[in-house]
Each structure stands twice: as C-alpha cells, then as structure tokens.
UniProtKB/Swiss-Prot annotation:
CDD domains documented for this protein: DPS
Taxonomic classification: Bacteria, Pseudomonadati, Pseudomonadota, Gammaproteobacteria, Enterobacterales
EC code: 1.16.-.-
Protein name (Swiss-Prot/TrEMBL): DNA protection during starvation protein
Organism of this sequence: Pectobacterium carotovorum subsp. carotovorum (strain PC1)
Pfam families: Ferritin (PF00210)
Length: 167
C-alpha cells in the first residue's frame, strides 16, 4: 500500500487540451482574444448597419466595399474565436456579451449620408485596428499573434479605404 498522499489541485477554468502553452499564457491570451471577438462582432454589425442605411454620392461603391469588409471581419472573428477554443477557452460571442463588453461606442442610427457613415465607421475601425495591434504586443502566444497580425493588415487597409472616401 502506498503512503503517498493525494494532492488535489485547484480546478482549472481552462478546458482540457494537449496544447502545451503555459496555463497563464492561455488564460491571458483567451482574455485578449475574447475581447477582440466581441469587438469584431460589433464591428461586423456596425458595418452592416451602415451598408443598409447610407444614401448619397458614391453609394454603390461604398455599399459594395462594406460588404467585402464585413465578410473579411467575420472570417477573422471566426479564426480568433476558434483560437480561443484551441487553447482551452470558451469563445464568448453572444449578443448580451457583445452589448456589455464592446470597446466601441454605440453606432448612430439617425445618420444617412454616405459621408456621415464613413466618418462614424472610420472612428470605430480605428479603435478595433489599434486594439488588435496592442493585443499583438501583449500576447505571449506566437500563433495568436500571427492570427492577429493578419487581421491587423486587413483592418489597416479597410481603415485606409474608408478614410480615402471621406471628403
């Protein structure tokens, strides 16, 4: 009979995975990534809000441009959320969570001109693009940093396109 004592470890908030990242790296990375999941969901919805409701000069060009942006944002959002799960987290993307945790201020629903929408979008795209860049510098997980670098490149390009259309 063994005299070894059983040592109970504290329960982990992480889901089991064979991924060997340190638990503290996983935990901090999950928090960073989940905030970005929230921001990307909000940005995708804001983009569609503008897409539906703008009127005026260059409507069709901007309308179609925003559709492409939204598709890419959703693709990045999915990749980021899946990375959360890959490293033992739970991706948080419900409407309730997005409403409580978004970094973006509420999008105005009383604007209609293409220019007003572009200005409102530029402000919000800049916030998300800057938050992604900050997260790249904070994460100690190279795979997550790589995912965020790809998203950062696209967001910077989208912001440039939006700003280039502002008169």
């Amino acid at each position: 009979m063994s005299t070894a004592k059983l040592v109970k470890s504290a329960p982990s908030a992480l889901l089991y995975t064979r991924n060997d990242l340190d638990d503290s790296v996983k935990t901090s990375t999950i928090a960073l990534l989940n905030q970005l999941v929230v921001d990307f969901i909000d940005l995708s919805l804001i983009t569609k809000q503008a897409h539906w409701n703008m009127r005026g000069a260059n409507f069709i060009a901007v309308h179609e441009m925003l559709d492409g942006f939204r598709t890419s944002i959703i693709d990045h959002q999915d990749t980021i959320a899946e990375r959360v799960v890959q490293i033992g987290g739970v991706a948080l993307g419900t409407v309730q969570i997005v409403g409580k945790q978004t970094s973006l201020k509420s999008y105005p629903t009383n604007i209609h001109s293409v220019q007003d929408h572009l200005k409102a979008l530029a402000e919000r795209y800049a916030i998300v693009a800057n938050n992604v860049r900050k997260a790249i510098g904070k994460t100690e997980d190279e795979a997550s940093a790589d995912i965020l670098t790809a998203a950062s490149r696209d967001l910077d390009q989208f912001l440039w396109f939006i700003e280039s259309n502002i008169e």
